[in-house]
Amino acid sequence: MKKINEIFYSLQGEGYHTGIPAIFVRFSGCNMKCSFCDTLHEDGIMMSDEEIISEVVKYPASMVVLTGGEPGLWIDESLVDALHNEGKYVCVETNGTCVLPGNVDWVTCSPKEGGEVRLNHIDEVKIVYVGQDVSVYLDLPARYYFIPVSYTHLRAHETSLHL
């Protein structure tokens, strides 16, 4: 059983897959406490893999994004295999502190200050920039970097981002 906050259909709004239709499976719970997080971590219902798949197949997208909270606390190879069996391309959005199953198709790591990244393979790094030193993330084993800038933070502090 896995604690699910919500399952919904939308377009991927950021990163490498921006604009692609996707089914989002938002897991509850996280091992980090970020002030800017938009997930209600305690909300959700316990669902089996079969119940998750039953909801996912109601939507037309071939891409599934496992997000959170922290999906690494919940996902396993059997869930990813079940999604693959339904013809789904499986993406995970993670803070990188949990080892992920090896059968995930795309890994987006959004590292957080104070969290040790434990991933050997990362397709994309997404850094939520709120004024921190992002150079510490440039050595992560990633193919792509995506840095959404917090406009309100930049305005408030008149800061510019230099990489």
Language model regions located:
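A short beta-strand-turn-helix
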Residues: 13-15
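Glycine-centered loop/turn positions within well-structured domains
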Residues: 32, 161
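Radical SAM/AdoMet-radical enzyme domain recognition
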Residues: 76-144
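Conserved small/polar residues in nucleotide/adenosyl-binding loops
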Residues: 152-159
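Residues immediately within or flanking Cys/His clusters that coordinate Zn2+
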Residues: 27, 31
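Acidic, proline/serine/threonine- and glycine-rich low-complexity intrinsically disordered segments
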Residues: 148-150
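Conserved Radical SAM active-site core
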Residues: 2-9, 21-22, 33-104
